[in-house]
Amino acid sequence: MRRGRRASVVLDVASGDQNPADPNLETFNALFQSGTYSGRAQLLGPSNSIRFEPTVTFAPARQLLASAGFGFYWRQSVFDALYGIPGQVVVPSNGVTDRYEGCRPNVQIDWQLTRHLSAHVNCIYAFNGRFEERSVGATRTMSYVSPWVTYRF
């Protein structure tokens, strides 16, 4: 890994259903989707979503890579729900027309231990937006840490 810094911005848009009453399902369906669609510590799937996430990545040491980002999330269609990674409804629309789903600051550290072995940790904190508050009364924030080790042949 090279030492240095990098700034990046991600903008993802995945369609949502514009009219739940018609027979056309317009919600984006990522067939065989990965749980890491928009990060290794992901709460929601890529259906009916808009994500804007600036991130800074730097290498404080030769085998160490750290990144910090702040993701902002909106619903692409106010007539559609929020979906989990396999595509199931997590937060139904319930007639709520707010788009703002929330924001999630996150930090990730990757450490290359040997040529084949690496260790990783990702920390995320989720703030609920107006949509969750009005749709299901979710006013509490959520945080979690996901550590893992990778061995590559």
Regions found by a protein language model. Name each.
Residues M1, L11-V13, F58, W111, ...:
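Residue-level signature of outer-membrane beta-barrel architecture
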Residues T114-P147, R152:
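Predominantly the C-terminal beta-signal and adjacent terminal strand-loop region
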Residues G4-A7, Q63-A66, W111, R115-V121:
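Repeated loop/turn-to-beta-strand initiation elements of outer-membrane beta-barrel proteins
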Residues R3, N48-F52, R99-P105, T139-V145:
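Residues that define the transmembrane beta-barrel architecture of outer-membrane proteins
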Residues V9-V13, A68-F72, V121-Y125:
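Transmembrane beta-barrel strands of outer-membrane/channel proteins
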Residues N19-T27, F79-I85, F131-A138:
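Outer-membrane beta-barrel translocator domains and adjoining extracellular loop/strand segments
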Residues S38-Q42, V90-G95, F131-G137:
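Extracellular loop and loop/strand-boundary signature of outer-membrane beta-barrel proteins
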Residues Q42, E53-T55, N94, R104-Q108, ...:
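Membrane-embedded beta-strand positions in outer-membrane beta-barrel channels/transporters
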